[in-house]
Amino acid sequence: MQDLRLILIVVGAIAIIALLLHGLWTSRKERSSLFRDRPVKRTKQERVETPIESLDEGVGEVRVRTSHPQEKPSFNHLDDDDDEVPVIQHAETKSAQVKTASRQAPFASVQTDYDDPLLGGLSAEQPPHDLSRDPLLGKADESYSQPQHAEPPHVEKPAHQVAPQQHVESQQEPVAPAPEAKPQKLKETVLVLHVAAHHGGVIGGEVLLQSVLQSGFQFGEMGIFHRHLSPAGSGPVLFSLANMVKPGSFDPDTMSDFSTPGVSMFMMVPSYGDANQNFKLMLQSAQRIADDVGGVVLDDERRMMTPQKLESYKARIREVLDANTIA
């Protein structure tokens, strides 16, 4: 315990000594800063007091004019003029005329010390604030008054511009040729293939139904079979299959008792997707059905299919697609 007390006493003494030293150091620092500022204050006071001490108590000439170089104007030049213009008169024996003349002298000397190109040749007797006689300001007023008269035409111009636009639109309405849409509708073609029995025979309905369903056809609208994008029957129709005999429809419930000389497959061009691929798929389906029912594939003129006829089908597809692309 005694050691702890000694330690605390020593620490407290050190802290007190440190505080005293810090206080002495700060007080000396403040004193040194005060001594440094005093010469500055004295010089400022001397500058303020020197003009009054250097003034001449006697009054000489009433009008004082000094010539200063005009090439390098500066603020010091103006300060010198201000120091020389006011004249303090301490002599009470001067007459009232001398006082009035001394009052007018600063204004005259300030106006005539140097020739200002902006002020022209104004003197103390000419009031510079008379702006009504200034030709420059008169022109400025006229220039400001002119846009007020020019504003109404600017407001009316949009009205004149709208009218031609409406007139142009009215002219373009009849120019839009409605017949251009008709050629696009005419640029369509129907590709037809037939599957017929050999030598005037007939195709049984039951065998035909099985082959048609296996080829991905689904019975649908107009009582005929349709080949959709998906064999399950979903998606757009790519091509269709109808009876070669009028009215061309089928009845799936009575297909077992049905027979026909052949069926017709047809597709529209342009169609969904690639027309060439759709035609290739239709040709493959026709060949498959022909093989299943024991028939043959015929062209749109009911003739035997030849390579030349296939090229003519492809040419028709290209012609329609190119025409629609140009349109």
Curated annotation (Swiss-Prot):
Residues 27-327 are cytoplasmic. Its main location: membrane. Residues 60-71 have a biased composition (Basic and acidic residues). Keywords: Cell cycle, Cell division, Cell inner membrane, Cell membrane, Membrane, Transmembrane, Transmembrane helix. GO terms for cellular component: cell division site; plasma membrane. This is Cell division protein ZipA. Residues 94-103, 163-173 have a biased composition (Polar residues). The lineage of its organism: Bacteria, Pseudomonadati, Pseudomonadota, Gammaproteobacteria, Enterobacterales. It is a single-pass type I membrane protein. NCBIfam families: septum_zipA. It is found in: Cell inner membrane. Interacts with FtsZ via their C-terminal domains. GO terms for biological process: division septum assembly; FtsZ-dependent cytokinesis. The gene is zipA.
